């Protein structure tokens, strides 16, 4: 799988700050994905290993007592139309592939 990332998001994954990747669709199994970093890099620069898939609508119920969490989850669902989050298990930087 090939996933595209903005440079700032790539850096958050690389540093370990970002622990979930949110998307509209994800397979329901752990995956390895090559990371394409968009402009100005425009290259494949890493590999990310994604683990368990979480359904954001389930999180709405799980975190219903935490208004801050519910607000963030709603933003992902309503603004970005994301349905899933996958745990970022591991990151591996590679040589740039242009």
Kindly give the residue locations of the regions a language model identified:
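Structured alpha/beta reader/binder surfaces that contact nucleic acids or chromatin modification marks
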Residues: 1-98
């Amino acid at each position: 799988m090939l996933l595209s990332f903005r440079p700032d998001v790539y850096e958050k994954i690389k540093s370990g700050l970002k622990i979930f990747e949110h998307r509209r669709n994800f397979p329901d199994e752990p995956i390895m994905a090559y990371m394409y970093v968009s402009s100005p890099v425009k290259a494949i620069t890493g590999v990310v290993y994604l683990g368990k898939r979480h359904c954001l609508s389930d999180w709405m119920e799980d975190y219903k007592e935490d208004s801050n969490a519910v607000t963030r989850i709603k933003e992902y669902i309503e603004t970005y139309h994301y349905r899933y989050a996958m745990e970022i298990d591991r990151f591996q930087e590679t040589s740039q592939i242009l």
